[in-house]
A protein has these predicted regions:
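Acidic-residue sensor for enzyme active/binding pockets
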Residues: 8, 23, 112
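Glycine-rich, highly charged phosphate/nucleotide-binding loops
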Residues: 75-85
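Alpha-helix initiation/capping motif
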Residues: 23, 73-76
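Short consensus segments that form the blades of beta-propeller domains
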Residues: 20-26
Length: 139
């Protein structure tokens, strides 16, 4: 199976090479959506979660990009722990992680797992990044 996922965040990291343990560097996840596809490309599962802000706010500059305000995420979001549980279920079913510039999203979620001391297999799976030299101008 192939897991395609994307996140929306509170912004961008100051240093893309910083370790995931540098919590001040990595922005917070405010939304995650994913699809699981089988080997024939058929959609098996789709999930989309707004994440309730836990001791952080969503800056206006980020809200202007993705449209998710602190108020919206607070009202309609779910606990990050629920997201971890559901995402780990999806990770347990997949052989590959796929996405456009997916390293960013992997780091965002990896930093979230680290912040909360949750073990994940996210960093153990092979990655297929659709952001190639040919598509780089679109990234």
């Amino acid at each position: 199976m192939y897991l395609i996922f994307d996140t929306e965040t509170t912004g961008l990291p100051r240093n893309y090479n910083a370790p995931l343990s540098d919590s001040e560097n990595w922005p917070r996840a405010v939304q995650i959506a994913w699809q699981l596809h089988d080997a024939q490309g058929m959609l098996v599962e789709h999930k989309d979660f707004l994440i309730t802000p836990d001791d952080f706010t969503i800056p206006y500059d980020a809200e202007r990009i993705h449209g998710i305000s602190t108020e919206l995420a607070t009202e309609q979001g779910v606990s990050i722990h629920h997201v971890f549980e559901e995402f780990e279920k999806a990770l347990s079913k997949t052989q590959y992680i796929v996405g456009q510039n997916i390293g960013f999203d992997i780091n965002i979620m990896g930093a979230e797992f680290y912040r909360y001391g949750v073990t994940t297999r996210l960093g153990e799976l092979p990655v297929l990044d659709t952001c190639t030299e040919i598509t780089a101008e679109l990234c």
